[in-house]
Amino acid sequence: MAALADSLLDTDALRVLREGRPLVDLRSPGEFARGAFPAATNLPLLDDAERAAVGTCYKAHGQAAAIALGEQLVSGATRERRIDAWSAFAARHPDALLYCWRGGLRSEIVQRWLAETGHRLPRVAGGYKSLRQACLGVLDRFGERDVVVLGGRTGSGKTRLLAEIDDAIDLEALANHRGSAFGGQLTPQPTPIAFENALAIAALRIDASRTIVLEDESRTIGQLGIPEPVHRELQAAPLFVLEVPRPARAAHIYDEYVVAPLACGVDRFTLEQRLSRSLARIARRLGGTRTAHIEAALAHAFAGSERDVHLHWIERLLEWYYDPMYDHQLEQKLERIVARGDAEHIRRALERHVAERSQTA
């Protein structure tokens, strides 16, 4: 089986992550759930109960007994089902790579079984641990990258503009959260480890000579903390401020937070309750009278579904809460501002700035 020794070297971990080749994560579902990589699919050799049993056996009786128990647990029909799943994945993704926790026994066994079916997939040397360490290294060195920041008041369309810019990283998309009290998505956020891995890979895929564009964020996005090296760059990098009138921002928020969820099948009552709970989170800072006003307007809007009524409560929320908060924060960043203006002005300013930085690099 010498040909199976074509597993990647530890030094190739960065290339594996950069290329985004399909990955077969052979760890147990519990291990996978704590954090993996965007290109990974969990097809475990051992499920959680089997892994626990093998681990207990290893501690009590040693490696040989643990291996024997593993072979007993994954035998017969169970083994055939798992080989079928790996083989089907390999057939769909012949360029896939295998990994387990350290690139050891689990991936070696699956590699051997797959070879017997005609699928010769390499395994990642060092396994998950090697890939994870590579991601942490990318984040630790983030301060070496050239970074600029796109800011602007809530609803100004920063994320939309970010999507049109080369070499941008959408932190909110990676965190599956729009970064405010109202920013939760219908699906849960990734684990902190998965978020860090995805962010590191996104940075790795932008050439080191290029400028990375990030959206201005606080220290956390929903429940996820931004890695400290990235947060330091957000606090220090040149800032481009997108300026959009409040009515246009309210219309944008209405489309994203009301129209889009309803179009995705969220019922009106559920959406109203979600927005009401989000409002309750900021009630103390908003104040009782203003909270009551917005709560009443929100209920009235959902009772009649009129766009103008929705725009009323959204504009009040911007006027009374989000705009003053952002303006206060911006006061602390005035010396970093390179340009302010509408989307087209900011796009051109960013292009000029990045071109100038590239020439002086």
Predicted feature residues:
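Glycine-rich phosphate-binding P-loop
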Residues: 105-106, 146-166
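Conserved nucleotide-sensing/catalytic segment adjacent to the nucleotide-binding pocket
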Residues: 166-234
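Short, acidic/small-residue loops that bind anionic groups at enzyme active sites
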Residues: 116-135, 237-243
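Catalytic cysteine-centered active loop of the rhodanese-like fold, especially the PTP/DSP P-loop
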Residues: 70-125
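A conserved segment at the C-terminal end of the G1
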Residues: 111-116, 159-170
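Positively charged, proline/Ser/Thr-rich regional signature most characteristic
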Residues: 17-90
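Conserved NTP phosphate-binding and transfer environment spanning the P-loop NTPase/kinase superfamily
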Residues: 233-239, 243-361
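Flexible, polar/low-complexity N-terminal or interdomain linker segments that lie immediately upstream
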Residues: 1-38, 135-143, 147-151
